[in-house]
Amino acid sequence: MEEFNVHKKLSLLIAGAAAGALALSGCSGAGSTGGGDSADNTITALMVGNPQMEDIQKLTADNFTKQTGITVKFTILPENELRDKVTQDVANQGGQYDVATVGAYEVPIWAKNGWLHELSTQSSADTAYDSADLLKPMVQSLTGEDGKMYAAPFYGESSFLMYNKDMFAKAGLTMPEKPTWAQVAQFAQKLDDKKNGVAGICLRGLPGWGELFAPLTTVVNTYGGTWFDKDWNAQVNSPEFKEATNFYVNLVKQYGESGAPQAGFTECLNTFGQGKAAMWYDATSAAGTLEDPNASKVAGKVGYVYAPVNKTEYSGWLWTWAWAMPKTTKKADNAWKFISWATSKDYEQLVGKNLGWSRVPSGKRTSTYSIPEYKDSAKAFADVTLGSIEHANPQNPGVQPRPALGVQFVGIPEFSDLGTKVSQEVSAAIAGSSSVDKALTDGQKLAEDVAKNYK
């Protein structure tokens, strides 16, 4: 992976608004409790509360624990809270967790600071693991400057547009394979039906650099904007950044879901999955849940197309939720056993056979897309998902050169705080208590302060 241009000091806290949900914690429930041997065979895992993580919590006790004798105590948190918790624990060397879900943004930075175990040694030595099968974009995003992998991808994703085929057919509308944002806005206007509780589109409005600004930064990119130009000049109040943000905010205010300022990935998944929105632009990983009839009312009724664009050919983001092992763990062997199991081919088979093939945590292994059962269950979205991942370009996601890697984020330590602070004001603009102009004027000042570290 191309070297990050990072500042030497990491701001230790990721700021962010609370996700508005209570933390859920649980234990795998297997094995005996108490006693030295039991404690030695128990590891702690911190993970984001997405469907794929909820699935692994269900499957661990009856499978991994029975096979290995290792009990896993899970703590599940909403995304913003997860980011705060894991950053505090890892950065402060708290040692509370043996494994944790982290993303493509954190891993290269934390690897540089020596906070994570490298996993290349274990993965290469384990022939059954078949590390060569892992998708290159995902491995590259989790690689440190030394060329070693510091987290194993659990599932990978880009972003695409999901739409309710029944609603489009009823309105006589046809969704193109590569829509523009202008077309999406027209569709949202025609399909918005607030009287019957249906939004034209669902878009994240919840503050957080990895919440609201995940989709919004891709809009900024395709509108010709960027957080910083190649010389580290802040561009937050540039015409392109402002045009993209105004477009996004107005689209949500006019045709978006109710409660948009508090809506993140989870809330939009529920809204769209309940048939309460005509379109949703978000993570490709949402498709598995949407196609599960036990979890979604729109299973079999969803169409999937590439992320909407304006000035670029593609605009999907690139992300992976991955399992990392903090340097502070005293149970590295058991932690690796869990990580290798959770990211293995066998685990994908386990999910497919027990929970349904559409729920396989995909986007990380080439072989996944050759499994007949998965191909059949994922035929509506597999090709667009893989194409979106392959076309995501963290080196050049927009129309101008960038000073650091990242599609929906800037690969520097300060971005977590910067992105979250600006997102809070943009969310306030969606709520009607502030304006885009104020949000970006204030954001420009914050970005200029960050840029001083790199000039």
Residue ranges and their predicted role:
Residues T71, A169, N393-K455:
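Conserved C-terminal helix/tail region of periplasmic/extracytoplasmic solute-binding proteins
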Residues M1-T44, K66, D437-T441, K445-K455:
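Short, low-complexity disordered leader/linker segments with a strong preference
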Residues A104-S158, L212-P215, A299-P308, S388-P397:
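Hinge/lid segment of periplasmic solute-binding proteins
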Residues A39-P51, I70-T75, D98-V99, Y150, ...:
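Short, well-ordered beta-strand elements
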Residues E145-F154, S159, A182-A234, C268-N270, ...:
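Extracytoplasmic/periplasmic solute-binding protein
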Residues S124, S285-V298, K311-T420:
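C-terminal lobe and pocket-closing loops
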